[in-house]
Regions:
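Active-site donor-binding loop signature of nucleotide-sugar glycosyltransferases
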Residues: 1, 42-43, 105
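Beta-rich, blade/repeat-based domains predominating
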Residues: 1-20, 25, 49-51, 60-89
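Short secondary-structure boundary segments
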Residues: 22-23, 43-44, 93-94
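Loop/turn residues immediately N-terminal
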Residues: 24-26, 97-98
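Short loop/turn segments that connect beta-strands within beta-propeller blades
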Residues: 31-36, 104-108
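Beta-propeller fold detector
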Residues: 38-52, 111-119
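Outer membrane beta-barrel transmembrane domains
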Residues: 54-56
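Blade-level signature of beta-propeller repeat domains, shared across WD40, Kelch, NHL, RCC1
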Residues: 76-119
Length: 119
């Protein structure tokens, strides 16, 4: 998944695509059923993400390095979920934002298991 790959929240759509986030590099990604991987949104600063990635693998992460990451519309993107009447709106959870960004997509997300009594 590349530099700054700290995967976090995930969700599936009706086509079997796995959507997810990378919390410190501020990315939203998707993996299709064939295993093809794409970055859909990249809000991170490449230099700061690389500095964190290097520090992580060298066991020298500091608050200064960590908190230098996290910017854009959803700093420290932590989760994605599908919602709305047609389940075609992606809602983005963030550890440092004060809002919940959302955007429309051309696919429907799978309904959450706990939405139905039979589960």
């Amino acid at each position: 998944m590349g530099t700054g790959a700290f995967p976090d929240g995930i969700a599936f759509d009706e086509y079997g695509n796995l959507w997810g986030t990378m919390v410190y590099s501020d990315k939203i990604w998707v993996i299709d059923p064939d295993g093809d991987y794409k970055i859909l949104y990249d809000g991170g600063d490449p230099a700061k993400v690389k500095a964190l990635d290097d520090a992580f693998y060298e066991s020298r992460v500091t608050n200064e390095i960590l908190f230098a990451t996290g910017q854009g519309i959803a700093p420290w993107i932590a989760s994605v979920c599908f919602g709305g009447p047609e389940r075609d709106t992606v809602y983005v959870g963030s550890l440092r934002a004060t809002n919940i960004p959302s955007f429309k997509v051309p696919v429907k997300g799978l309904p959450m298991v706990h939405w139905y009594d039979q589960y």
